[in-house]
């Protein structure tokens, strides 16, 4: 029974850590973090209360490891570089210089997966970290994801509308291809040579002579020499064609 009572605090620390450790401070203060109930601490882990204030994502991240040389190993990209140091040869007790955004829970992990936790509240973080315009570009992912989602929804809606209209409209008949008449090569027509009109009275073309009807009375009568006026005498006409 006495052994069980001695092991009870260790079992509770493994199950839920050290629930009584809580620290408050202002930016610029120095606070001490200690491992309570952990026999062989090997690393420290930090879960920020306002990760956007530091440009981080939610979740735990390691901030310190124990090493065989006695000098703790600090990750190069952790937010406590230059402000966190060990107070003993191990990593059981740490000193932290507070800064805005350091609020969160610090976990001290043991070799047998036991842990203790210390909750840190930095005064002013609730107001400072919720102010508009957080640093380190943390606002961009928060705006980019909704915009991408809205664009995806609009694109899918447009595709659905086009598909629905395409199904409702009757299919259009296929127009026949235009037909072209074969090209026939025609020879140019030669100009018709006009015949020259015949000139009446051309004796060379028409050797025959046609005589008009003569005055038979004048021909049947012998011509008399008369002293009468020549105008009174009968006239003989000849028509040459």
Curated annotation (Swiss-Prot):
Lineage: Eukaryota, Metazoa, Chordata, Craniata, Vertebrata
Any GO BP annotation: blood coagulation
Protein name (Swiss-Prot/TrEMBL): Megakaryocyte and platelet inhibitory receptor G6b
Function field: Inhibitory receptor that acts as a critical regulator of hematopoietic lineage differentiation, megakaryocyte function and platelet production. Inhibits platelet aggregation and activation by agonists such as ADP and collagen-related peptide. This regulation of megakaryocate function as well as platelet production ann activation is done through the inhibition (via the 2 ITIM motifs) of the receptors CLEC1B and GP6:FcRgamma signaling. Appears to operate in a calcium-independent manner.
Extracellular side: 18-142
Cytoplasmic side: 164-241
InterPro entries (alphabetical): G6B, G6B_V-set
Pfam families found in the cross-reference section: G6B
Subunit composition and interactions: Interacts (via ITIM motif) with PTPN6 and PTPN11. Binds to heparin.
Originating gene: MPIG6B
Motif ITIM motif, residue range(s) on this chain: 209-214, 235-240
């Amino acid at each position: 029974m006495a052994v069980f009572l001695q092991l009870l605090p260790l079992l509770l620390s493994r199950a839920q850590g050290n629930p009584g450790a809580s620290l408050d401070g202002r930016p610029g203060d120095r606070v001490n973090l200690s491992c309570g109930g952990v026999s062989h601490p090997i690393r420290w882990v930090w879960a920020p209360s306002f990760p956007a204030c530091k440009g981080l994502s939610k979740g735990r991240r390691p901030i310190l490891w124990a090493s065989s040389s006695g000098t703790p190993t600090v990750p190069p990209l952790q937010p406590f570089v230059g402000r966190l140091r060990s107070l003993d040869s191990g990593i059981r007790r740490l000193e932290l210089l507070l800064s805005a955004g350091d609020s969160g829970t610090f976990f001290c992990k043991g070799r047998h997966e036991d842990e203790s936790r210390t909750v840190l509240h930095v005064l002013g973080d609730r107001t400072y970290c919720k102010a508009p315009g957080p640093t380190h570009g943390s606002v961009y992912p928060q705006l980019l994801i909704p915009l991408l989602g809205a664009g995806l929804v609009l694109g899918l809606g447009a595709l659905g509308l086009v598909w629905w209209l395409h199904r409702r409209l009757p299919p259009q008949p296929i127009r026949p291809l235009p037909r072209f008449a074969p090209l026939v090569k025609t020879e140019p027509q030669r100009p018709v040579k006009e015949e020259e009109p015949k000139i009446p009275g051309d004796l060379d073309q028409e050797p025959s002579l046609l005589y008009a009807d003569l005055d038979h009375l004048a021909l049947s009568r012998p011509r008399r020499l008369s002293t009468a006026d020549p105008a009174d005498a009968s006239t003989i006409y000849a028509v040459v064609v």
